[in-house]
Each structure stands twice: as structure tokens, then as C-alpha cells.
Amino acid sequence: MIKSEFVYLVLKDVFSIKGRTYNNRKHIQSSVGWLSKAQDEGVDGGVSAWYGIFSGWSEPYIETTGYIISTFLETYHLLKDKIYLDRAIKMADFLVSVQLEIGGYKTYLNSNNKKDLPTIFNTGQDLIGMVDIYNETGNIKYLQSLTKAADFLCMNINKDGAWKKYSYDGKSHSYDSRVSYALIKAYKATKNKKYKQVALLGLNWAMRQQQLNGWFKNAQLPPPNPIVPYTHTISYTIEGILCSGILLNDSKLINSSKKAADAILDYYSEKGFIPGTFDSKWSSDDKYTCVTGDAQISVVWSILYLLTGQSKYLSASEKVNEYLKSLNSVDSKNNNIRGSMPGSYPIYGDLIRGQGYCRLSLINWAVKFFTDAILLNELIKTNSSIKYIGK
């Protein structure tokens, strides 16, 4: 049965009615409020993956629960409210409870046999949050968990830097650069040089997928997704390389990520719109946006602003964020909707072509990256220190 609240969301997009926007802090509070609701709808501290038009609240998504930890820790330091730290700790404890003996975290919560296997990419995203919660609390159980996860990732990389075993489809992907980024964070936390060595192996593989124009091969999700990558996975790739480059002070990595980020900025500057996917020529005829990807590229541009001081990056980030704020349903009276973000805009994607990303769903990773984007803008605006996002 269709959830009645989606009728409003669909009609709003049909008639291009945008929501009212507010200051950054109001949107941050609204978004982490929705993520808190998603956590309460989950199990044992895990964050529900989505609120769907037919299904309502889903079971917790182990992968995204991991990197939502970092968002809550950053929010805790900005808003000075311990509830966000407490919730981050509950997420971390949930991850510890679903970690397998071989070191990776479960891919699915309610899994059996084959589905009990971990996934390289998902474990990497959980490792990001586990490093951050360890750095925040100093709790030895988180150190033990992150060490097991990092060791698992190191044991399963190929000599050429590709991660194929325990991948979604037996193939390595450019966006595994965010797995390398997680290992760099683990290296910084533990001083285990093996983590850095393996991370660089993976990063070099990812950079070998880059074309001269900055586009990355092998950045698409497995079928039945499009044969060209969503901005979501393109941004994962850029983020992983950029943040690793910053942590290692490696100009080669930074320049690689910057080339791709600049290509998207050029497109956005000309079109005023970021399409859901890009082909190898940085072109697209998509009629929808991938909201998660929009938020992620905003994060990338803010980080590049902090790195270079070039105002074009901050200006583009702020402009994208203003559009994203209008999708945030801050004024909704329904607490399943208020503070959420859709998978696509319009929420139904491209109905004629049957295209879109997570259509007719409100997804926790879109909210996570939107919150990160707004947090960065607010921290830059107030000249405050950034503790976790991109660190």
C-alpha cells in the first residue's frame, strides 16, 4: 500500500514546488533529526536504510550506518549536544555486533549462508566511522574492531591494487578509492604502515582508471544499474582520492581528484544542473539528478576551497546546497518526512525513460551527505575547525 505522505512529495515535484530554505543550522538539526528517527526505526543502534513509498521503514543498512557515525560526531562538536555523541556510539556498537570473524562487517543484517559474506566496499565505509569513533572516545573495543576490518581489507587486495574478492560482482571499482581512504585513516590512527601501503596500491589502481579528461572507468554500479556511473559513485571515487591525497600530502592524488571535480564544475557552471549520470565525455541527457551525488560533489568542492582558497569552489558548493535545502522538507509535520532527502529529483526520476536513482524513496545516505555538505558550509562560514568530514 502506498504511504499517503508520498502523494504530496510526488505532486510537489510534478509542479516544481520547492520547499522553503533556512539557515544552515536549522537544516543540520532537521537532517540529523531524520537520521535519528531512522536509527530509532532500526535495530540495536543501526540506521534504517530508507523510508519507501510502499515499504515504509527498512531494516538498518550496515554500510551507511558506518559513515553516518562521522556526521554525528561532527554535529556533536558543532552543536555541543551530547545526544549526537551517544547516538554515534550506539551506531559503532551496532557495527561491532555485526563484525564477522574474518574481519569484515556483514553486508546484510538479516542474512544467511552466502549473504553472511562481507563486502570490501561496505567494510571500508564502516571502517571510516570506526576510526572516527575510536579517535573520539579512545575506547579499545573500537581500536580492535577497526584493526580487524583493516586487516581484512589488506588481506584481500590483488597485487595490481584491485579488490575483486568480496566485491559486489567479482570486479574492482574506481570508487574503492574510498576503501583506500579508510585504510589511510586507519594508518593515521594506528601507525601500521601496512595499511598505508595497501591503500596506495588501491589508489594507484583507481588512478589508472582515469582518462585524460578526468573521467573514471569502472565507476559504475553493477547491473541492473546504468552502464554509465551515477554522480554518487563518481563522487565516491573523487572523494576517496582527494581525502587520501590531503591526509598524505600527495599532490598527485589531489590533482587527479581535482581534474574530475573541475570537469563537473565546468558542466554545472554552464548548465546550472548536475545530471544523474555522466558518460566518458562528461556529457549526459538525464532529466533527473542523483541527490546523493549532488551533495557529495558539494562536499568535494568545499574541501577544494579549503585546500586552494579558490572562491569558485565555495560558491558552487553553496549554490548546490541552497537547491538541496529546498528538498529537505524542513516544514513537514510528518516526522517520517521532515529532514529527509529523496534518492532522485524529481523523486520519481525520469518516468518516461524509467530512469533514476533510488526513486520514490527517502534514503539515509542522501541525508548523510547533505548534512556533511551543510556542515562544511557552516564550519567554513564561522571559521570553525573541522574534525571529521574529509579528515
Predicted regions and their residues:
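Glycan-recognition and catalytic cores of secretory/periplasmic carbohydrate-active enzymes
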Residues: 1-391
